[in-house]
């Protein structure tokens, strides 16, 4: 049997479950997940390896109309996802309308490559609503194969994965067979801390910070990490730190717990 490999790029509106899907497919938490929009700022590769195939999944930022430079940069990541895909996954959720950007929607319906439309969050619907939604989306995106799924509950995800394997082109692997992602360790430290900031702070604070890991030293039983949280204005420092440092301590404890699971070492 010839080896298969290809790039499978996941696109859709914000908060439809793209990151949850990729994490479920890969079996590791690579993309941060919160209820806030635009939590994915970068394009993240997650790699699934088998003896006969390699799937390189790409989680992209949710599609929006850019209002400032960071959002424009985020949409550039989405544009590149159209250009290098072997298979497109268009992720929608029960009850939503088509993409907020008509240009991207037109690219999907005129795509020359296989398109899988994954209708997510079906655990929030009934059979009648589901059948109606499948018919609606089949009319809107006639070139797509539709898979009703629940990424959170891992329902029908395996069936979608099997179909992806069938559609993969014959190719040698693009990455080493033991690779999980194309991102370095520091990237996941930054993203984990940023996820905890998104979960613990309100209003503009989560979107006004950047995280940079300045030190990552891996020893036999422990990883020593030093990260810096950068804010836009001095007045935001006090909010991040909190009363007697309580807010920042909470972020640190939550991030450390997740990172110890991810790296399987003491942090």
Feature-to-residue mapping (PLM):
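Conserved C-terminal guanine-recognition region of P-loop GTPase G domains, centered on the G4
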Residues: 52, 76-144, 217-219
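Conserved glycine(s) of the Walker
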Residues: 17, 156, 247
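P-loop NTP-binding site
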Residues: 185-267
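Catalytic P-loop NTPase motifs of RecA-like helicase/translocase cores
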Residues: 40, 63-65, 97-98, 125-126, ...
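Canonical P-loop GTPase G-domain recognition
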Residues: 114, 123-181, 185
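Active-site glycine-centered loops adjacent to acidic/histidine catalytic or metal-binding residues
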Residues: 59, 120, 150
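Conserved G1/Walker A P-loop phosphate-binding module
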Residues: 1-82
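Conserved, well-folded catalytic cores of nucleic-acid-processing
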Residues: 28, 47-51, 66, 81, ...
């Amino acid at each position: 049997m010839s080896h298969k490999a290809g790039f499978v790029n996941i696109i859709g509106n914000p908060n439809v479950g793209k990151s949850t899907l990729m994490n479920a497919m890969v079996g590791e938490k690579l993309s941060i997940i919160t209820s806030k929009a635009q939590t994915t700022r970068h394009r993240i590769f997650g790699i699934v390896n088998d003896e006969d195939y390699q799937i390189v999944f790409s989680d992209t930022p949710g599609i929006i109309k850019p209002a400032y430079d960071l959002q424009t940069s985020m949409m550039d990541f989405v544009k590149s996802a159209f250009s290098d895909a072997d298979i497109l996954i268009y992720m929608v959720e029960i009850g939503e309308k088509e993409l907020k950007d008509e240009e991207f929607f037109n690219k999907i319906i005129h795509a020359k490559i296989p398109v899988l439309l994954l209708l997510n969050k079906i655990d929030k619907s009934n059979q009648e609503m589901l059948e109606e939604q499948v018919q609606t989306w089949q009319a809107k995106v006639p070139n797509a194969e539709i898979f009703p799924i629940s990424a959170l509950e891992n329902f029908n995800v395996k069936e979608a994965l099997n179909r992806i394997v069938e559609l993969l082109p014959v190719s040698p692997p693009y990455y080493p067979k033991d690779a999980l992602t194309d991102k370095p360790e520091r990237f996941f430290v930054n993203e984990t801390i940023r996820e905890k900031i998104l979960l613990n702070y309100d209003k503009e604070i989560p979107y006004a910070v950047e995280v940079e890991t300045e030190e990552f030293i891996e020893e036999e039983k422990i990883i020593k990490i030093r990260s810096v949280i950068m804010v836009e204005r001095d007045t935001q420092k006090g909010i991040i730190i909190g009363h007697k440092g309580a807010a920042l301590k909470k972020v640190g404890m939550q991030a450390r717990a997740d990172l110890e699971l991810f790296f399987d070492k003491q942090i």
